[in-house]
Amino acid sequence: MEGKEESAVDWAYIESVLPLYGKALWLTLRTGTAGILLAALTGLLCAAAIHWRIPVLRRITAAYVEVSRNTPLLVQLFFIYYGLPKVGIKINPEACGIIGLAFLGGGYMTEAFRSGVEAVDRIQEESALSLGLTRFQTFLHVILPQAAAISAPAFMANVIFLMKETSVFSAVSLMDLMFTAKDQIGLYYRTTESLFLLVSAYLLILLPLSLLGTFWERRLRHAGFGT
């Protein structure tokens, strides 16, 4: 009986720390969303550079994609947070998380958008150019809307992947969900309760994203994209 009592979940404790986890959840969401938005913008610009076939930009973009996708986020965060201050560049934990996630995610978003852009028939681009549109106008108004629709499933998969990667932010002292759970375990030995709250918080973030991605993909299939 004593063993059962010791292993029982303390719901009163869970209720008492909900505000603490609420703050950590908001910080994780805020940092993750900012990083993902920057990653999407980076990926879009890189995909455009590849599409326009500018040799220098293509080489720089290719090198960036290889580095960002083939180095762990944790290593990137350590370089930003601990390495850059050695050359006089100091970055706070939240900014470090955003920059690191954007750097990692930009490589994945580049590939997602690039595949979408390449799936658009080149004849459409040639037709738009023959009508007097500039290359930028053609990309913005003709290619990008179709490429975005085609890339949507890969984009949402990347969003979910990157949001899960926020779990390593605690390594640079960002007081996110993982940091809070580890802190509570270390201070009060509330392992079961802390992990329960951690898992619940990430499910609260990721399940809606997963459902949105599935819904979006089905809508696009019905519309005739990505088939």
Region spans (language model):
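Transmembrane alpha-helices and adjacent helix-loop boundaries
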Residues: 2-227
